[in-house]
Amino acid sequence: MRKSDSHEISQLNELKAEMGAMAFVAHYALAGNIIMDECMPIFGGFAGGLEETTIVNVAAHLNAFTLNMATWHLDGPVHMRWGCTTAREALAVAGHGNRAIEEKHPTLMTGNQYYPVAGPGTVMCLLETAAQAITDTCSGREIVSGVASAKGVKVDKTTGLEARFMGEVCHAVAGMPLDQINEILDALVAKYEGDFMTADEGKTYAECYDTNKVVPTDEYLEVYDQAVAIMKDLGVCYKTW
């Protein structure tokens, strides 16, 4: 690995230090490497409810830059029941937590990782991705890390089109007023949160892409267009849509 590559250290839930990781921190720091600290606070887990998990999330950020000497922190509040980062509560933890960090420590670099419930080739996956992209952009994150579709647990269930949609939504909402953002998010999350139990885990990469040309299939582009139309109706429009 190059020094410029991110070298990962993971915190244990919640706010636990693992002595084996300390050796890695020391090695990375002495070698002058980029250190990426990762932690996924669990809503409904050890921390408790929304407010408590948000406090833990802020503390995890601070822990990353102090104890683990991080160059940047990769967040990922996850819902205990659904195992995703796109549930309403997980988004609230991520948004409020990072907003608090940005208010007091705007020079700290933060990111968030994406684990939607639905898989590639589905409108729901793209809408979940959009909700988190909006939350991350408008709470001040510098890095978006995604998309691990189908909760990141199904083999070969992720493609580049989800990441493209994530980036487009980030650009589309940058600079929008927070009161407008909250209205959009409330309406957007309501479109998919009732379908977590029956969510489609989607298709494989080879089913979503022409593997020779490395481009999405016409079928997947139709799904993408449906998601774009929904976002436009909500007031979100990227320049190429």
What are these regions (language model features)?
Residues V147:
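Active-site and donor-binding regions of nucleotide-sugar-utilizing enzymes
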Residues V169-W241:
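Long, compositionally biased intrinsically disordered regions
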Residues K3, K16, K104, K151-K157, ...:
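Context-gated lysine
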Residues G48-L50, T159, P177-L178, T217:
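Helix N-terminus capping/helix-initiation residues
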Residues M1-C138, E142, K151-D156, A163-H171:
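Helix-rich catalytic cores of soluble enzyme domains
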